[in-house]
Amino acid sequence: MRSRMMAVWTSLLLAVVPSLGRSQMIDRTATRVQTTLRTGWKWLGTLRPRSVQEIEGPQNWALGCETLCRDYIYWDTYKDYVAPLGIKTIRLQGGWAKTERVQGVYDFAWLDYVIDDALSKGLEIWLETDYGNPIYEGAGTADLGAGFPTSEEGLAAWDRWVQAMATRYKGKVQKWAMWNEPDIGVRKTPEMIARFNIRTAEILKRVIPDARIGALSLARIDPRFLDDCLRVIADQGKLNLFEWVVYHGYTKNPDDAYKNVEAMKSVVHKHDPRLKMWQGENGCPSERTTKFALSGHDWSELTQAKWNTRRMLGDLGHDCISSVFTICDFDHTGREINRKGLLKINDKRNLAKVKMAYYAVQNVVSVFDCHLVRQKAYRCTIECAQPITWFAYRHDQLGSDVLVFWNGTTFPQDSNDTLPATIRIAGGKFHDPVWVDLITGRIYEIPGECRSLALERAVFTRVPTYDAPAMITDRQVVLR
């Protein structure tokens, strides 16, 4: 009898503990991130993360939950960590080859499971139409870079799958994206890419008239190539199919991307001012890797956190939607583990830890919500030994300003040495300002001798700056 009871209790524990274990790996203490950063100022508290259920309104953020279509990682491995991060929109890939293993037979069960579970957690789906399917001649393969369908048979099969997927998820998925990175691997011309985009988007719109679609999903941040693609779409009178232009483009220093991004914005505006920019995939490894983007450099969890937060806030400051790549490391079969995840894995089914970047992204998301309105004509000067990147926002309910800044002159370093800066602001809205480090989430008092507030003029002296985002805002914005 006793052994039977023990067996029952063991079964119950095995059923419950895995899910509890996944959730319990999130550190919710005020000291969840500790670095060597020293300000010399009084620590007041730490930013409180907000889950997707606690954040109202639209966001500027998206989160990568890719490669489930190729079983490089599994939804169950990390699903309990998505909603607590605070990003509502997740990027999924449609996975034609996983869904149609026998010609004409669609098994969406795997994707149903992910989408339904995500929706139950308050998430929104951004679904990408890819990749190919080797069961049809001339229809490509299931992996990145193999090229989209080109044969008559392959294209017809593609059309049927896109229609079936759109029909199945009508009412569940409104945001869609085109084939991922068609400009790498098998050579595709701008005309081929544009026409394939039109073909796919027209099917989506026919099934889901209010579908919101991102065009192109280009790997490169190449203004000329983008111009060539958009010209074809414009010449066909089909720009109205799309709401966003999606691009990726990895740079070792995240700040180095924006010269080309601004040029791309000008190209987009020339063709259709209505279209918005969406950075659809960017992230940084947490260790040295030999393959994939940003390989061959000694990254760390700290530099990953700095890189990701700089990318997010740089995108926000340049009016681009920003996607974080990716929620979890994944094991690219036949190559190596891609270590760009916010969560570290031992293998596809087992997490090792929550990385520093997870908490840093949480910090950014907890502050930069729909209530912050960018102040494009903000009157601010920052005097420092190094050029400082900065962007200003105003809270539309509290009336307080948020000034975020960092040293973006080089790629993130493992050092946390700071340089003092003097910040002068005219017309700012500060009442009880504090200094916040967005890597650790720690909030510090700005000493009286380092701040002067008078008649909407603010001067802050000896302000710590370094190669990660920090901000000055009122206490009421961050200590609520």
Tell me what each language-model feature is.
Residues 284-366, 376-383:
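Aromatic/acidic polysaccharide-binding cleft in carbohydrate-active enzymes
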